[in-house]
Amino acid sequence: MVKEFLGEGSQAGQNLLRLVSRGNAIIAELLRLSAHIPSVFKLEDRNEARKYQDILLDFKYLSNPDFYESKIEENADLVDLETEFRDNHIDILIRFYHLFESIYKYIMDLEHYIVDVEKGFYIHLTIEAILINGDGKQLLSEAVYLYGVMLILMDNLIEGPVRERMLISYLRNKGPVDLPLIDEVCKLCKSTGYIPGSPKKPPNYPEEYFRRVELPENVISMIVGRLRSDDLYNGTESFPQPEHRSVALSTQACMIYVILYFIPDILNNKNSIMREIVDKFFPDNWVISFFLGFTIDLSVAWEPYKAAKTAMGNTIIQSNIQYQTQRFWKEVSELNKLVDDLLVDGLLVEEYIVDNVHKIITTLRRCNVTIRWVMLHSNASQKKFKDLVLMGGSQEDVLYLLLNTAQLEFVFKNIFQQLLATKEEKWEENKKLASDSMVELSEYFSGEKALTRVKKNENLQKWFGEISQKISQLDSTDSTSTGRKIQQLSLALEEVEQFQQIDSSIQVKQFLIETRQFLTKMIKIVNIKEEVLVNLSVCADMSYAWEIVNNYVDQMQKGIKSDPKCVLKLRATFLKLVSILDLPLVRIAQCSSPDLISVSEYYSGELVGYVRKVLEIVPKQMFLILKQIINMQTNNIQEMPTKVEKERLRDFAQLDQRYDLARATHSVSVFTEGILAMETTLVGIIEVDPKQLLEDGIRKELVLQIALAMDKTLIFSGKPYQAPSNKQQQQEIELLQRLKELSNILDGFRRSFQYIQDYVNIQGLKIWQEEFSRIVNFYVEQECNSFLKKKVYDWQSQYQSVAIPIPKFPSQSDQNSQQSVNMIGRLARELLNQTNCKTTLYLNQIGWFDPSSGKELVGINTWSILHQSVGIFGLTGLDKLFSFMMVKDLQVFVSQTRSLVEKSLKGFLNEFEDYLRPTTNIPDTMIRYQQALDKTKLLYPIFIDVLTKIGQIQLIRRQISNQLNFHCKIDSNMLFSSLDIMNKSLLNDIESHFQRPDSNPYPSDDNTLLFDLAQYLDTAGINDPFTKIYITTSPLEQFPCLLFLFVLSQVSKFQFNSKLNVMSSKKQKNSYDWTPFIIGCITILQQFHSLHTQKFLAFVGQYIKSHINIALANPKENNKDDADYPEDVIGLLRFLEDFCKYSHTSRKIVEGYVPPYIFDYYNN
């Protein structure tokens, strides 16, 4: 049974294999999640730490949970903050908890497995028996080793305090009822006090950490004993030379390093065992990769342990370090020359490789051992040791050796695989040729063949016939006996040449020589075995370099800069790095685990990310040259007119400038040639297409350049226009200056990108449109996050990409930008700043201008330049951001108003409304109006600020909509017409639905037509921002009356400006703009039922009629010489006229509350 430990019927073997497979999958998830720890849990940012310190608790919460819960519950702000925090982070918290729980379950399952084996659950099987079996000792050692790796990686990649905050956050949100293992998981994940990267470690770390969930010590001791004595993975077959023994046993060395922490007594007290371990595994190395490139310096790690430190003394003595350094750096220089000689064009052909398999494999083995030692020890933790190693030679030589070794491996593998594929064919071909030669010689000595003129020799005839039969019977499957037989046959043929009858015949001798050559080829062919490639893949393993290889990115990029064709060698290096995937995937694949795909995708994705990182230098260099092209096209080369006079042709030739442009263009194409020359490469399970790789790199660099240009350009002083001094005039036009500057930069990029697209084989304008829209939408999304309870994080955003990331910039700290996350927010707030209702006046015909100087601040020209600079995507993004701002203001305003009415004004307003009812009657006196105004006057400052800001935003959105509408008609009239017709058709359908709901049903919930069409309509500017519903509100019956009183209190503060044909503020101080005021009122009324608007108009109409009635009854009291109507009546009539104009309310509706003759008299 032990012999078939991994057989299908072996439950013990299959269970252990599944456990090890699960361990590898858990580690992949740990690595994946550790890269996505929300920054808030680290509390590195002071503002975040201050904000969340009361709800982000560590394990101190467990000592007195009631105290902390009551503290949160008593504070409404903390309750809201926690709700928001939970909504944003619960998904990632669930994944982290499942990870921590999986680690604990893995440990418990491993412990249960060991207990089951010891109790005899698996018949005739013991721990000792498992450790005797080849597969058994590998799997059991790996299972314990992976447990240790999980603990080390968890403490290094997810710091203790972070783990505690995550667990407590998850516990408080889920409750202990659903979490049966929470106590055990908390015990395992409790902070160890260790800070990654810190030279100081807590006392007894990590052995105390490893002891939190203990495994049987006797089992660990047996595993360590097996690791000490056996070659578990038969590494010496791939590394037969004695000087390579430490590399041959390197996998075991990593395992024994980790497992020793489970029995620290060996590290502390067992001098003889530690000396044996060091002599066997670490005689010439002290820096190891214990898992996928995570390195450890044993001179530091084993410093606290007496026996281990003593044992390592001989290895880290300076003389030994100097000797090993000199030895390996000498190997670097020798091997570079040797590999260069092997890579000479035309040398590595099938015949040469067949003849020199052993020589090439030996060379590659030496190369890999040397690269491994130098790379690892160049990464030593102790500076004095690291300096000694680095002094030995240049890292460029190491990289050169790595590239050439990878190229040699790549070429050798390809040719050797072809030889394996054609092995049988060539074997049969040479066997037939050799056999036929013997048959011909046999016939030759028969003396019967025409023209032979040779004396018949029956013995030779018979002998050659027998040799022919023996050759025909040779079998390539048994290489050992076949090789011996071929040698005997070859020797026999050599001896037969001595016969006089043969020696005298040149023709026969030639036949014999050729036959021996065929036999020699057959010996070489029979030695072409799969084992050669298996051993080579073991030697070429680079799992130790998962992290270290990042140190060579800059040097690789320098190589590409100086020689773009160097990319071809890099392809072989990338393929060599794929060997990294073998270690974590081999067991998962072996048990056909469903985790194989997700784990493969993760590791392959990380490798592809590295490939992109190395090759991104190509688009970087391309964009450096592109900047020169932009400068030439923008400043040096004149644009050719449609028609030009013959005499002026020479002026437009600009031969020198065009030569410089051509040279720069050629440089770009040369840079891209290298990548495009690469073949499609399979990196793990991800296919890397060089053309796509180049395009992604270009996209990434384009995104970076556009984002940088926008971030650097869209920075504003944040000061509103005040007075027309020279300095302030510069501030006044700052917005236009910035927009023009950005427009010029982006236009230069766009033109040059369009120019260069054919030379690098890409669709330039398509890429430009896609990436620019993604950039703007991402920054708008991030800016809108501040208005959302449930945030959209980078990794959740549909616009963010791992391969083509959009950069994030720190927020600007100036006065205007303090609330802005990025440049889109700064631009939006600068527009609000320049159109401030307190300092500007809005006219429909021109936009916003300064009333004191008459200077236009934001007009038609501004929107045109804004379109040129940020495009359609920028305009729609700004519109979306302004919508979010307005919705936030509307929600806060309605909530505050409702709260104030419920608290103190509800009774009074109900009483006042009762007095006014019915609104068709005229009240007896105006005193009640004044009393109501006095009662509610404290609300008016809040109302005027909020409503004018809402109106201001709505006016800006209307201007954006007009700009989008205009450009859609010009640039895409067919699309505009189609959308317009579709919109009208749908409106008709909706209308008919309300008229006959039974025969014309409303679309079902899963029909997204209205939602999808609305997005197109907004982008095309076919909308009316003023009449939209932005928030859902419950009825607030007193609101129409309250809004009426507010409007009544404000209209008297405005007067009609006959020159501008608009109402303007009487006082310059604390003044507001008329148009935003009206539009703010329209917008707020649209958020309620239409009955609210009717009630509001009824109150206004009643007041106008009653006031006119009183004024006409007492003409002496009306002190206006130029009008029969009182001042506030005139203001209200103006208000109603503009209300109808902006809200598209029918005049007939208003005339139902205010008789038309009143308007006619007022207008005349």
From Swiss-Prot:
One of its GO terms (molecular function) is identical protein binding. GO terms for cellular component: cytoplasm; endosome; phagolysosome membrane; WASH complex. Pfam families: Strumpellin. GO terms for biological process: actin filament polymerization; endosome fission; endosome organization; exocytosis; lysosome organization; phagocytosis; phagosome reneutralization; protein-containing complex organization. InterPro entries: WASH_strumpellin. Belongs to the strumpellin family. Probable component of the WASH complex. This is WASH complex subunit 5. It comes from Dictyostelium discoideum.
